Amino acid sequence: MNTALRIEIAMKVMNMTEIAFRRRFERPRISRPTRWMFADISIILPGDGWTAIEATFISVMSRKFTVMPPIKIMNVFLGSKARRGWPYPGYDYLGRAREWIAELEDLKSGLSFPVEFVNETASTMDDVRRIEKEMEDVDAILVYILTSESTRFTYLASKAIARFGYDHIHKYGGYDVPTIYVVDLYGGDISALPLVEDLKNIGKKFLMISSSRTSDIARALKCIYTLKMLRNSRVLLITKREANPAKYLSPEYISRIKEKFGTDVRYVDYTDVLKLYNEVDDEEAEKLAKKIFEGAREIREPSFEDLVKATKMYYALKKLMSENNANAVAIDCLGWLEYDKTPMPMTPCIALSLLNSEGFVAACEADLHSAITMLIFRYLAGEPSFISDPVIDTARNVVIHCHCTAPIKFGRRDNPYILRSHSDSGWGVGIQVLVEKGIEVTVAKIIRGLEEMVASTGKVSGNVDVDRGCRTKIEVEVKDAEKYLYGFRGGLHRVLAAGDHLKELEMLGKLIGYKLTLEGE
């Protein structure tokens, strides 16, 4: 299929998505993932209720898009027919490798992102050296330790493969290739267990999967996918640095973010947003405002004219991302209100809510730590997330997560919402989203220094409707609110996403190099 036809199909699908979004954000559900393979390009409509093509592969903003290839995984199956060792002498490791390959193909078909496998087997160190020599650019190496023998081949080969990633840096530039070891139970265990300490001693970032669940391999692949997407992400930091000289907004700190996560951060001035805001077609903004206005459960403070200005801000920020090939923004909204001479035409709360619902990442208060955390949730969990100001109630053992920018799309569904003003300033348009009671949520944040992530899980016990504080207030049960309170650190904000993603966050931390600390335990 030629490129022009691929592009035409992609554009038609995205046009359908845009229409569905405008119809009160009601997207028809798909019973199972649908995969379209166009040569080396994969387009997926996930079977989780989303009709939007994942931003992973095609990011369409104002008719501009980027096609992302699938993640490329090299599977290396290590084994030998030794006279002594596990599973038993003369074991058919090649037959076992074929079984693994079949299992991996089945696993791949159920993923919500495309994966390309390159399969290799090795029974001698010469095979290992050949694989290293022939290895092309890959996103990760998965090493399957099938046997443990008296010659210690699989142990020594596994250590040698750990060096592939470092050599890859010099060959291709950029980052170490993540290495994931899979222990074939009752076969590779004796070789694998001593390997853990050895790899830690050389500072290797790796995962060791010793599990009878193939879903753990799927989790690892999701981490690789997230890593790749972080390295292909760009955040637009909308602020005035001279007016907001916080250390974590400095060029030096942004360089650390690039080094750690591979994510590009670019400074943008408020005047650039205002210019695009003034260029937005009023009729287009009014149409979207009408849909949002009619879809609200209740309108309290804002007028329809306020909402039109809010949708113009949405279109302006979306155009800004398009022009800068970005998929995320972090806007210093409170700073704009407080100290900038450029008048702010409207609070960006609704714009951020819509962008997050749509699959982009939009963070307020120029919070880069939260923006990176939101990007992680976007790709690791496949979920919109939002920044919160936590309120801790030790009497009821809950934390209430408050903000004015919550996405309407949260917990795999479109939630009821009330149109409000922005609470801090008392003007503009904010949003009060009422999320489903009983759903599991993960609360997390990369904290200052980028070496640690704090995280917790809990169930939504309700939505609080009081005028004090930010508009959306999601009440979450925690294990120990007292411990949560006295252990709180890393700045005010937290990021909330639907689902329990602690295991994936922990695995990702082992590959990126951050420590996961549980809050409130």
Please name every model-derived segment.
Residues M1-I9, M14-K64:
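N-terminal, intrinsically disordered, basic low-complexity segments enriched in Arg/Pro/Ser/Thr
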Residues F65-L193, I217-Y225, P251, S255, ...:
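Metallocofactor- and cofactor-centric catalytic cores in central/energy metabolism, strongly enriched
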Residues I180-K200, G359-F377:
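Ser/Thr/Gly-rich flexible loops in soluble cytosolic domains mediating phosphotransfer, phosphorylation
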Residues Y186-T226, R378-T405:
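Short, glycine-/small-residue-rich phosphate/pyrophosphate-handling segment
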Residues I224-R256, K260, V399-N415:
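Conserved anion/nucleotide-ligand pocket segment
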Residues A289-Y379:
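Long, internal scaffold/assembly segments composed of regular secondary structure
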Residues N356-V464:
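C-terminal catalytic subdomain
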Residues G428-E521:
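Extended hydrophobic packing segments that form well-structured cores
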